[in-house]
Structures are given as structure tokens and as C-alpha cells.
Amino acid sequence: MIRAVIFDLDNTLVDFMAMKGKAVDAAVQAMIDAGLNLSPAEARSRIDQIYQEKGIEYQMVFDSLLYDIFNKVDYKILSAGIIAYRRAREAALVPYPHVHLTLMSLLKNGLLLGVVTDAPARAAWLRLCGLGFHHIFHTVVTFDDTGVRKP
């Protein structure tokens, strides 16, 4: 008899890559509006390269971009990017269709629910809370808990 169901978070419960893409695109446009002298395509390409080198959850990506360009961080441009990123990320943080209904159905059937994710603990819990899922899962295991990435 099945007693528990374990889910991944990103790209299973929520379309992480679409959310990330919308957030980065908004940040790029805001940084350009604040004085970053790059085309949107060039800025996005540089940001994608930083993510490839440092990991998709790298929190200092805009700092790194600005330092690479100016040899310092321009806080006006950085702040514009961060605010736009956060606003777009929150707007795009929605579960895939039928996820909420499925989770509720599993809970009603008495199953325990868990999440195993490669995301850092803070990022995972922010996503779960943003989705309203923080009270649904009995166990959440993050990269910070194990120090190991999923296969």
C-alpha cells in the first residue's frame, strides 16, 4: 500500500524555468532603463553564462554582471534589476495546472507528501510559501539538508 508521495519542486510542481526566464527578462529591461548600456540579448547572454558557471540559484548574478562590465557594482542599476526580478518572479510563481487539486486529493486519501529538491533551503521554502504549499508537505528535503544533488 502506498503511504507517501514525494515530488520534486522545480519543473514538477511549478514551471521554474519559465518563472526564472520572466524574472531575468524583467531585470534586464529594468537595468537597461536604469543605465546599463547593453542590448537585452547581450545582457541576457552574459547572465545565462554566469548561471552556467555558478549555478541557476546563484544569488549574486546581477552583481557579477555589473562588476564584469564596470569593475564595480552600480547600485542604481543593481537595485532596479533586483526589484524588477522579484516582482516578475512573484507574478510568474504559479503551480502547473491541476497540481493543487492533485495534492489535495492525495492528502484527502491519507497520503503523506514530501518534496526533494536541488534548490537551497531558503529558495525552496520561499517558493513553497509563495505557492501556498508550505502547510501541505510533511517533509521537505533540500540541497542544504543533504549537500548532494539529485541524480
Language-model features: locations:
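Catalytic-core regions built around general acid/base machinery
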Residues: H98-G110
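Substrate-recognition "cap/lid" segment bordering the active-site pocket of phosphatases
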Residues: A92-V94, G114, P120-P151
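A short, charged/proline- and glycine-enriched loop
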Residues: M1-I2, G110
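Class I S-adenosyl-L-methionine
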Residues: D25-I32, M104-L107, W125, C129, ...
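N-terminal helical cap/lid subdomain that shapes the substrate entry/recognition surface
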Residues: I2-P97, R122
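Ser/Thr-centric signal marking residues that sit
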Residues: T12, T102, T117, T142
